[in-house]
Amino acid sequence: MALDGIRMPDGCYADGTWELSVHVTDLNRDVTLRVTGEVHIGGVMLKLVEKLDVKKDWSDHALWWEKKRTWLLKTHWTLDKYGIQADAKLQFTPQHKLLRLQLPNMKYVKVKVNFSDRVFKAVSDICKTFNIRHPEELSLLKKPRDPTKKKKKKLDDQSEDEALELEGPLITPGSGSIYSSPGLYSKTMTPTYDAHDGSPLSPTSAWFGDSALSEGNPGILAVSQPITSPEILAKMFKPQALLDKAKINQGWLDSSRSLMEQDVKENEALLLRFKYYSFFDLNPKYDAIRINQLYEQAKWAILLEEIECTEEEMMMFAALQYHINKLSIMTSENHLNNSDKEVDEVDAALSDLEITLEGGKTSTILGDITSIPELADYIKVFKPKKLTLKGYKQYWCTFKDTSISCYKSKEESSGTPAHQMNLRGCEVTPDVNISGQKFNIKLLIPVAEGMNEIWLRCDNEKQYAHWMAACRLASKGKTMADSSYNLEVQNILSFLKMQHLNPDPQLIPEQITTDITPECLVSPRYLKKYKNKQITARILEAHQNVAQMSLIEAKMRFIQAWQSLPEFGITHFIARFQGGKKEELIGIAYNRLIRMDASTGDAIKTWRFSNMKQWNVNWEIKMVTVEFADEVRLSFICTEVDCKVVHEFIGGYIFLSTRAKDQNESLDEEMFYKLTSGWV
C-alpha cells in the first residue's frame, strides 16, 4: 500500500495533500479534489474542469467561498494565502447571473449582471447597456416591505410584479459590442436622440449592436409608460410618515461590495434608482432614456407621496403627466411611419437646456462684471416667537452679497439697519399659493444654539422670483453676480406660471375629458378630498399652461418642478445624536447635512459640506463623526440602517461635486471607493 494513500487523523494524506470539496452549481454536482495548500486558485479551477470532463465554456465561472462570503478572484493566490483548509466548502459558479431589475418607471426587466463585481461597477455596466450616462448617480436597493400589510406569500408578490413586466425580456450581455456611453463629458459626442421627442436618431440596432437588448426593444426605456390601472397605484407602498421614508433607505446596497457578498440571490428583484440627487449635464440629445427614467422616478415619488407638494403643484404635475402621456402615444405612432426628423432651431436651443440645482448657464447679458447686483424693495418680515401675536412688519430691505439688511424706511437706508442677516448656510423653503396670492420665503438661519426662523413675504410673482433666487444662491455662499442667478429667476417664474388657473375654462373641449383618469394622475390624498369630475376639470385647466410644450420639454419641466419642491433631494435616516436621548432624523442632501425633528421634519440645525474638514466612522460602535470648521463636531449613531450607508452618501456627494464638464475621461472608480468604502 502506497504511503500517499494513507489518511492521517487531521484529514490530510501522508504526502501532504488533502481533499477539497467543490460544488458545481451548473451541474448540481459535488466534486472532491486532492490538493495542497500551495496550489493556487487557477490551478484548482484547472484541475476541477479536467475532472469534470464536460465540454462547456467555463470562462465566466469562478470559485465562491460561502462560509466567508467571498469570491476567490485572485487566481495567483494559493489556498494557504486565502486560509482555505479541508473543511471549506467551495462553489464553482458563473459570475454573471440573472437579476429582475425594477427600473425607476416601476417596470421590471431581466438583466444579466456580474455578481462578483462591486455594485458600483455592476451599476455602471447596467447603465452602459441601457445607454444611461452618469451611472454614478444611480444604485441598487432591496425592495422595501410595506409594514401595514401582513406577510404575503411569494407567489402573491410575484403576480403583482408580473403585472409590471416589460414586453420582451431585456438581457444585458456580459460582453460584446454594445453602445459605449462616453465618460463624464465629450465635446465630440454625436447626438443619439431627437431633442424634440427623445426618439432614437438611428435604429436601435445601431446603438445596441447585435446584443439581446435590441431584440427586447430597448427604445421602450425612453418612452413614458402611463399608469394603466388605478389598482396598480393603490397597491403600491406609500410612506405614511417621515420615519417610513427613512426606513426605505435601509435597503441601499453597499457599492464597495459585490451582490453575492450582500446575499443577493439569482433572479432576485432589486430596484435601480437615482440615489444621488445631483443630476449632471442632462442633455436631450444624448439622454432620452436617462431623462425619461428620471421623470418616472419623480412622477412616482409625487404619486406615492414620498415628497410633499401643494394642491396647485399637484394639479400642475398631473397636467404635465397627462400631456406627456398623450405625446408619448402620438410619438410612438409617428415613428412607425417616419423615423427621420429634423431638429428645428427651437429644439436645438432646448437640447442645450440643462437642469441642475446649481444652474450652470452663462448669462448672455454679462453687464458690468466688476459690480455685484443688488436688490432693494419693501418686503414684509416676520420673526415668529413663542407667546407673541405680532404679524408681518414692512421694512425697506436691501440684498447685497449674501446678506439682507432691513430698514424702517427707504429714507433711512443710508444709516444703520434695524436688522441684518447673513444667509450663507441657511435653509430656504418656499411657501406659495398662487390662487391666494401668497408668496412667502421661509429662512432658517444658523446660529450657535440652532436656527433662527425668519419669514419674508413678497407682493407679487416677479418680486418673489428675484428674492427667492437670491436667497437660494446666498445659502450656497453665492451672490447675484453668479451666472446661474438669471436662470434661477426664470426657472422660478416658469414654475409659477405652470400653476396658473385658466381664466376661461369654457375653452376646454368636452370630448377630451373622457381620456383622463384622475386616479392615475394625482396622489390618493386629493382623490379623497375632491370628486373625480372636479379633479379632471382642474387638470385640464392646468394643462392649458403646458399644452404647447414638446415631449422632452414637458419631461424636463416636470423634473425641474420636482427639484423646486422644498423636500427635494433630502435622504432621511433615523439617528440618535451624541448627548441626545430621543430618536431624530439626519437628512443628507447634495451640499449639506440637516438635523431634523422626527415628527415634523423641521430643520433643527444645518451643516454645509463646504465647511466640512473630515468625517469618519467608528465601525465598532457604528458611530459617524463629522468635523466642521470652527471646532464644530457632529456625532450620531444610525438606529435603523448600517452606518456604512450614511458614510457612502456623504462620500458619494463629495465625489459627485468633483465632476466638471471639461473632463473627458471615464469615472475614477478608485476615488469613489476611497471616499465611500471606509476601508480601501
UniProtKB/Swiss-Prot annotation:
Question: Which GO biological process entries does UniProt record here?
Answer: adherens junction maintenance; cell adhesion; cell-matrix adhesion; focal adhesion assembly; integrin activation; integrin-mediated signaling pathway; limb development; negative regulation of fat cell differentiation
Modification Phosphoserine occurs at: S159, S181, S339, S351, S666
UniProt cross-references to PROSITE patterns, sorted A to Z: PH_DOMAIN (PS50003)
Its annotated compartments are: Cytoplasm; Cytoplasm, Cell cortex; Cytoplasm, Cytoskeleton; Cytoplasm, Cytoskeleton, Stress fiber
Q: Which residues bind a 1,2-diacyl-sn-glycero-3-phospho-(1D-myo-inositol-3,4,5-trisphosphate)?
A: K383
Q: Which Gene3D superfamilies match?
A: Phosphatidylinositol 3-kinase Catalytic Subunit, Chain A, domain 1 (3.10.20.90), Pleckstrin-homology domain (PH domain)/Phosphotyrosine-binding domain (PTB) (2.30.29.30)
InterPro entries of this UniProt entry? Band_41_domain, FERM_2, FERM_central, Kindlin/fermitin, Kindlin_2_N, PH-like_dom_sf, PH_domain, PH_Kindlin/fermitin
Stored Pfam families: FERM_M, Kindlin_2_N, PH
Bilayer topology annotation: Peripheral membrane protein
Quote the annotated effect of K383A.
Answer: Reduces phosphatidylinositol phosphate binding. Reduces integrin activation
| Entry's induction text | By serum in lung fetal fibroblast cultured cells.
> What UniProt keywords apply to this chain's record, in alphabetical order?
Cell adhesion, Cell junction, Cell membrane, Cell projection, Cell shape, Cytoplasm, Cytoskeleton, Lipid-binding, Membrane, Nucleus, Phosphoprotein, Wnt signaling pathway
Query: Which intervals hold domain FERM?
Result: 189-661
Question: What are the boundaries of the region Disordered?
Answer: 141-165
Outcome when changing K393A = Reduces phosphatidylinositol phosphate binding
Q: Where is this region: Interaction with membranes containing phosphatidylinositol phosphate?
A: 40-81
- List residues of the PH domain: 380-476
Question: Tissue specificity, please?
Answer: Ubiquitous. Found in numerous tumor tissues.
Would the keyword Cytoplasm turn up in this protein's UniProt record?
Answer: yes
Q: Please list the GO terms describing molecular function.
A: actin binding; actin filament binding; integrin binding; phosphatidylinositol-3,4,5-trisphosphate binding; protein kinase binding; protein serine/threonine kinase activator activity; protein serine/threonine kinase binding; SMAD binding
Q: What is known of its domains?
A: The FERM domain is not correctly detected by PROSITE or Pfam techniques because it contains the insertion of a PH domain. The PH domain binds phospholipids. Binds preferentially phosphatidylinositol-3,4,5-trisphosphate, and has lower affinity for phosphatidylinositol-4,5-bisphosphate.
What the protein does comes down to: Scaffolding protein that enhances integrin activation mediated by TLN1 and/or TLN2, but activates integrins only weakly by itself. Binds to membranes enriched in phosphoinositides. Enhances integrin-mediated cell adhesion onto the extracellular matrix and cell spreading; this requires both its ability to interact with integrins and with phospholipid membranes. Required for the assembly of focal adhesions. Participates in the connection between extracellular matrix adhesion sites and the actin cytoskeleton and also in the orchestration of actin assembly and cell shape modulation.
What family is reported? Belongs to the kindlin family.
Describe the subunit structure.
Answer: Interacts with ILK. Interacts with FBLIM1. Interacts with ITGB1 and ITGB3. Interacts with active, unphosphorylated CTNNB1. Identified in a complex with CTNNB1 and TCF7L2/TCF4. Interacts with ITGB1; the interaction is inhibited in presence of ITGB1BP1.
Q: What is this protein called?
A: Fermitin family homolog 2
